[in-house]
């Protein structure tokens, strides 16, 4: 099977510069000795409107740019590559490889960059040519076609040509769950599908969490819930695209993993404390951004989203400064007991999913103890007040309501280890948990 998978050793990076609706070639990627290196093209360096793809990683200068310590390819490039789901789609559609066979194949990162769809998250794309840009997978499939395609990929069944084209469009998206990209006249969405392995309504859980986050004052991506082919589909409005006369502008983005100069093998070291330090020095509106990030950490704990890894946080990049993107991928995780931990460290070596962890770290976000307490209390009351209405919007079954409420949402473990004046939060959580009819 591996003989069918080509190993590309070079690719050309194309980028949509700020305000533009067409890309220009930025430079060349080449694979060597297990690494992927980048150099800018002269035409791009001499372009008056050119910006670095990301600093300090890829400064706008001539020659091969050294990789940051520990990395095998530039992080801002890896951000544009597909993750688990997109790789399964590519291997299925292109090479007939089932998902569980991926680990046995020696596949170049450039293969995934060059075989994935062109409408990827952010402002980059990858081409075989430095002079001719040819977008891949422009077909706009129906949700029903996409649902059917996702089901076949999960089962390892080769796609038909029609379904192949339908799902390829979303093969460049990150994440492990089934998803695809869709477009209407003025808005683009990421469509997230139910999985055959789901033991409860994961899609509805994410819809509820995202809606509640927005109601709690968090800048969260807009979401809607629809049905297609008898399945729930979550539509997440893309915030990296702007519709203008003549086409679409793309907004450059980098993940927190890239900001922290880490890769997947080092992701366990990713820390909100370190991210807060970067925000203070490199972000627009640092004080407001720190408060927003603190609020997101609190909400993740209150809703049971322990999958808050560093690729689930991102910032727009304008060539000089970073700006936090809307929140996304806030999804309550399955939980059999109480004790839990976050994917990212909160401060020091502490990643425990407790409000006490947030309060202890508040000073890193330039928040006083009373300010941090007020944020937690406000979210608690907001979640409890809006839970019945948002659950109804999601047509959540009684079984799933009982599963989510008090287990993912407002799990008692989140309120352990609170001391002094903060202990009022535990009492408030107990009151709200018991007063709201799931």
Region annotations inferred by a language model:
Residues 1-310, 314-438:
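Phosphate/dinucleotide-binding and metal-coordinating scaffold of catalytic cores
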